[in-house]
Amino acid sequence: MTGGPSQIDTWDPKPDMPREVRGPFATIPTRLPGVRICEYLPKQARMLDKFTLIRSVDCRFSSHEPNMVMQTANVAADPGTNPKARMYPSIGSVVAKHHGANKPGIPPYVVLNLKSRSHIAEGGYLGPQFNPFNGDLARQALHLPSGLTMDRLHERRSLFRQMDKLRADIDHSGMMAATDTFSQRAFEIIAGGAAQEAFDVSREPVAVLDRYGTHDWARQALLARRLVERGSSFVTIDLSNHSNSGTWDTHGDNIPPYGGIWNGLRPLLPVFDHVITTLVSDLDERGLLKDTLVIAMGEFGRTPTLGTQGSTDGRNHWPIVMSMCMAGGAFRHGQVIGASTRDGGDIAERAVTPGDLAATIYHHMGVPLDGTYTDHQGRPVPLIERGEPLREII
């Protein structure tokens, strides 16, 4: 949810506070007794027993671009203070290395709706072979150029492997090994045909296409389901309509292009509500939800008081506390973890760190929590500096 959705105007409303805090939205009850959320999330409210809300995510040091802290689970990856922030591998890249794809011929880590590469953390110290596959380019990337047959492709591959062996004999940096791994995976993806089929959403029945709808986010969610169903192990959808900063960056109507809470955030919420609930329901009906962890989150929260940067209807960045939701993954859902203060501006109970979120994902994916990778100086770096799987849902 690129840009940082407001915690107060989504999953952590403050209906008893003055309007300048509670905002313009009403709240509605949910399937969980005593739990209320924003009025523009009615579908999620009706099936909140399948979700876990986290209202106490510690998002200090997080920023827009690149959003490294939340995507790498390492506070040292703050680009504002660390020029090497880009070298910390993303959670998806770690999963790609330690878990790989669930089926051959499918990229393990895919990014969809990639409006700006700077939004997404990559392989870093793990190497470019663990960068995410740009799913937006799949249609052109997975088809052979005109005049190139599959037999000819196999001949070229054989020749390249002979040349690679000669170069590897004189290579001492390890770069050739990484390149060979990367090219081998690329060849398997192109030659196998499974990826072409997975990325072709038009193969879905009309009823399924209609169920998801025509909005870009909905089609990306459907594509994500197809990829998971066919073997991808980590898929990220950038829920943004803009190439810079992010759609959820609702500073105010006088600060384009995102608008404030009423004109900017309000139109997004019904779309998001439909997308997240349709995806979770579809995964559940197909028997995939218990194996698939679905997470919706931004990079930080927003100010507890309306009227920032000269606006009367927006909220500024607030890298102190944020809310998020998750579903699936054979975890125990139907609960709220943590709490914010009365005005939604700080953590009151059970701080959840980026490391805790990463540890929960790694626990789900079978990645060793005590694992390490090596930096460019040959020093071991822990996959998680500090963090444990969320005990409440395990």
Predicted segment positions?
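Ligand-binding pockets and gating/stacking loops
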Residues: M1-I394
